[in-house]
Amino acid sequence: MLNDRIAVTCFQTLLKKSNVKHEMEQTNNYIVNNLADINRNTFPALAGSVRIDFNSDYYISGGQIVVSPKDSNAYVKLLIVYLKYCYINYSAKTKYPPQSLLAVLDYDSFKAKWVKYLDKSLTDYLDDNKTEGCSFTEQQVVEKYPQVDSLVAKILYRVCNSLGKLLDLKDFENKNISGFEINTAQDSPTVADDNESNDFFRECVNDQRYYSSLSGSKLGKAKLEANAYIFKILLKSASGEFDIDRLSRNPLAISKFMNLYTNHVTDSETFKSKFEALKSIKTPFASFIKKAFGIRLNFEDSKIFYALPKERQSDVLSDDMMVESIVRDAASFTVVSDNNYLPERVDRFVTQLLLELFPKTKASFPNKIMFGFLHYFALSTTNSKRFNDTQESTIEIEGETLKISLKFITSYLRNAIQSQHPDYADSNIVRLWCNKRSNLALGYFKSRNIQLYLYSKYPRLLNYMRFDYFKGLDMGKLTDEERLSIQTLRCITEDRSEGTLATHNDLNSWILRP
């Protein structure tokens, strides 16, 4: 059943979404456990004046229900079983039995009509079928109210069709519309018509106006499309029970997001502006969603930070809290051997030397400076043969920039070490300093999905692990795939260092393994 294309399409057209695996598994399991009863039950219904009997002769093969006979009614019966026995609180939502809702003489035509609206909203359907359930066309409304602008005409089109009559424009402008009143019994609970609910209603109307103004122009549509991925990032950072796809397409949710976001983002082209804007709007947006839809959203800044695209090194280092979180995460890692890094006193000395290169920011942002250098040293090999490289690169920390080359940085460190710690003057200071921070570097590159390009011609090497100061990594905290990448790095660096036939053969054998 789960692999039956006809059954899948039936569930998709019923639920108006493409991913129906969960609902089909529920139905399959229920029928497997109640096969005799389900086959015995006939669900009769009327399609107009024609009686339809939904029968089946299902059987089990490999734990899966096989539909028999292969006709529409047997497939529709699957949907009846789902609604009647698997769908939660179906009877509380409608008094109609499922078979009455699904009584269609030509179900194949019904499927063909609805299959193109999978994962779309009712608004999408109504946009394509403007006369559906309407007493008046858009043209009739425009002719009735020639003096109003296009936005008001759209609102009148919807309101008049909801009420079933063409309104007096004065009543509309004065909000004297009573057609939406619901008569309740005297002993029924009432909803207070207080100022707070009126204010929220006006807020929704204003947001909907804003959305309509955007969707009604080419420039506005382009703005909606350009910010759709930002909206998705915000929703994906939230925890809570909600359908992210439906909420991301809801016009009211979109309009509230756009209203908040465009009022908070200062420069839509920068990572920092986007991140600060999303942090600012998450609370009012969550409050609105709770009022409008009863959905509780809890946003995580770290998820927003990681998901937003970053183009520069300064983007990755732009948030103090995120940088500190990596430092905390790495505290549980252990370095394997003292031989792989500098003694504590020498390591502190080297760190201070690097900080001194950023005189304006060294006191406030030492961790950012550290990550900046780890990133810089990961862009090329730290093999001592490269230390005469004069190609310049730029590191930017909180607006302070440093132009350096490998030749400059190694000469700068070696001269200072020669003076204060001469025993280590001939050591590969850069690699030993980086080795001690390799767990920090791995967490930094991995969490931000940073693409490194060292050893780019070699396959089977994770992009965020393409750095050669890996000997301080805590192997016990790595995934299986990361351990394989470490072995690849070992083979590459050994072949680069020794260059023997044996190391070359070892590298080829490892890279070309099955």
Curated annotation (Swiss-Prot):
Domain of life: Viruses
InterPro entries, per the entry: Vir_Hsp90
Sorted UniProt keywords: Virion
GO cellular component: virion component
Compartments it resides in: Virion
Pfam families assigned to the protein according to its UniProt record, in alphabetical order: Viral_Hsp90 (PF03225)
Name of the protein described by the UniProt record: Protein p59
Species for this entry: Lettuce infectious yellows virus (isolate United States/92) (LIYV)
